[in-house]
Amino acid sequence: MGDYMIRATGFNGHVRAFAARTTESVEDMRRRHDMWNTATAAAGRTLTITLMMGAMLKGNESLHVKVKGGGPIGQIMAEANAHGEGIAYVSNPHVHFELNDKGKLDVARAVGTDGFVYVTKDLGLKEPYQGSAPIVSGEIGEDFTYYFVMSEQTPSAVGVGVLVNPEDRSVLAAGGFILQLLPNTPEEVVAAIEERLGQLPQVSRMIGEGLTPEEILDRVLDEPKILSHTEIQFSCKCSADKVVQALISMGREEMEGLIEEQGEAEVHCHFCNERYHYDRSALEDILKDM
């Protein structure tokens, strides 16, 4: 089973919901950036939520997320679009702590609690939408729950988890869900959701046991109606062609100076950790086309 997410409604349309399996995408991120366990959990949770937020968009809309809590992990950056494509990285991927008192990876210690969650949405308008909310726990899921309420005025519940193999650092399971109450939701529906959430196992455990996003929503919603199914992939917008265009945009004089002084160029994409190297011969070929 590959990565995918679903969009659904429940409780007679009073709740909209998103659920995702992101195991392969988070593992791809971990491998590309050589992340240590706690960093993987923090960035993987953020990537999972960002992908589900992408499912709230349409067409060519996209969003950018930044989590900056003042912890040793530094910033977590993530991007996603409406088509299930997302990517994420952290400032310092080599962060790992012992398990916390709940027996879980100590994500809060890595992220920190002195900072904000920032969300920027490109909705095709003149100016992008920008929202933010203080970090309340550093556990990511709780922080985005608070963000939705404070910045987007949408009562929400966010559950997210990443299970990492302690021996080889590989990602065993990753996924999450977002529940959002629509206006005028009856109190009995709110009470029913709260009760079900209180009985729900950890998301990473459910994914690890083979539960699908549909089965996870079955546990928290009353006969959910599936509206869409979108495949997910860890996908970056960088490419060799874009790098060449960036080099061309330097102008002929600056390119000649680069060849003369350095004789080579390397461009590093922070999101996917890809490196594009151009030796003197390659740069001279680009110069000929300018």
From Swiss-Prot:
GO biological process, any: protein refolding
A Pfam family assignment: HSP33
Domain of life the protein comes from: Bacteria
Gene3D superfamilies membership: Hsp33 domain, HSP33 redox switch-like
Record bears the keyword DNA repair: no
Post-translational modification: Under oxidizing conditions two disulfide bonds are formed involving the reactive cysteines. Under reducing conditions zinc is bound to the reactive cysteines and the protein is inactive.
GO cellular component: cytoplasm
InterPro entries from the UniProt entry: Heat_shock_Hsp33, Heat_shock_Hsp33_C, Heat_shock_Hsp33_N
Listed GO MF terms: protein folding chaperone; unfolded protein binding
Keywords for this protein: Chaperone, Cytoplasm, Disulfide bond, Redox-active center, Zinc
CDD domains according to UniProt: Hsp33
Disulfide pattern: C236-C238, C269-C272
Subcellular location field: Cytoplasm
Its biological purpose: Redox regulated molecular chaperone. Protects both thermally unfolding and oxidatively damaged proteins from irreversible aggregation. Plays an important role in the bacterial defense system toward oxidative stress.
Annotated PANTHER family: 33 KDA CHAPERONIN (PTHR30111:SF1)
Family: Belongs to the HSP33 family.
Protein name: 33 kDa chaperonin
Taxonomic classification: Bacteria, Bacillati, Bacillota, Bacilli, Bacillales
